[in-house]
Amino acid sequence: MAKKSCGNCEGAYDARFAGAVRARRIAVILDKPPIHTTMVCMNKRIVLIGAGSAQFGYGTIGDILQCKTLEGSHIVLHDINPNTLKVVEQTALAFIAEHNLPFSLSATVQRKEALSGADFVINSIEVGNRFELWEQDWRIPQQFGIRQVYGENGGPGGLFHALRIIPPILDICADVLAICPDAWVFNYSNPMSRICTTVHRALPAVKFVGLCHEIGSLPMFLPRILGVPYEALDVRAGGLNHFSCVLTARYKDDGRDAYPDIREKAPAFFGNMPSLNKMYKYFKETGQWPEKDEDFAHVETEAWPERRVFQVMLEKFGLMPITSDSHFGEYIHWAYDVTDHKGIVDFYQFYKGFLSQVQPKIELKLSERVVPIIEGIVTNSGYEEAAVNIPNGANGRRIIDNLPDWIVVEAPATVDAAGLHGVPLGDLPHGFAGLLTNQVAVHSLTADAVIHTSRALALQALLVDPIVGQYGGLEDMLDTMIDYQRPWLGYLQ
């Protein structure tokens, strides 16, 4: 998948809008490490798996090429599609030559060749026709009476997505262990938390980290809500991927708790937002997307567009999610009754159409967080990254006390030469922890279903999922999905 399947980068007023519009190229500037201005010749080998996707390939290549610390490194592009891979390779080589950049680059359809000597591996794959399979994940369970809001990462749709994509990712990781066992593997593919949890259970020696940029909503929204620059705030968020909330927020100047102000002021902000359709209308009329306050003054607004579950979390749980309903609502049994279904469908149709028309290009600017993390490792910087996906018990201590050690959580982490070290968040508020705990058995059974190629365990993963409120028809639904997606799910016995 052209990654960023992790969702869609958040920006301007609507997280989903910014990710699609900017092709997931919005930089998340949180506690960003300094960019070194003197050349440090690292000569690292950085492998991009899934690089035939122009969105992922061009964006990540640009991220690497803008980094002074990594000058002298060799970039290896790998994809199973030789035609798209060749286009990305030729474009990248021409860009490097045009700008006289101190990097080398090659491409290969042979994964083992690509991984030979790798220091860092960045994975962003999808299998089959992304949108055709996604629509099956979403719509077929609905035909059997399952009420799911999106079908990408949670609920039955998230299960089938996971059952398809995890086996090839395990194959990639097995090759990493055999060929370049010391390499760091960074994953952008979804369903993030199920992928990462399964990899760490099946191949615990792999240095596997999941990255998602939904955290990028906070620098976009909180300054507008609180009236202060994001740099004036000390914010930490955590939970599971696409299922995280702001846990603490303080003003740096005096240490005051900013959450009371968030709870007071956020409803007026999110209750008067432009929908994606209205922003797209503005784009068609003006030729540009609204970004500044004066732009949004000309865009019609509505109440909580694609943020009705978000609204319940803020008003009833006192917590602000870092993403919108199409992600957060996938994991909650009551979300279907609350969510803005039209907003979700509008986003999906826009996103699908936009990706078919967008023409990505290489730019020398930072768009994602993987390169700062790599830079933090190679320079032993010790900076804090705002959101990574790592095992809850990594480094011998729990990040979130009221979740099990083995599940992969999303949390801040410090980055140094030894790797990524999760920042302890303690006990999460019990209400939010209860929602997260509902996913524990789902993730465990998903991992075991893949590892043991077990249809019975896949069925159990459905039966313990809070999105599933019925037994009747469930086995027929599972068998229907296996039949429709037999090239990818036929291994389930």
Model segments located where?
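N-terminal Rossmann-like dinucleotide-binding module
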Residues: 46-71
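Rossmann-like NAD(P)-binding element
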Residues: 80-84, 101-182
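Long, compositionally biased stretches enriched for glycine and/or charged residues
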Residues: 227-493
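Glycine/Thr-rich phosphate-binding loops of Rossmann-like dinucleotide-binding domains
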Residues: 56, 131-132, 196
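Short, positively charged and aromatic/hydrophobic N-terminal segments
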Residues: 13, 25, 29-34, 38
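Internal, well-ordered domain-core segments that constitute the primary functional module
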Residues: 171-255
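Cysteine-centered motifs
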Residues: 6-9, 41
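NAD(P)-binding Rossmann-fold cofactor-contacting core
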Residues: 71-91
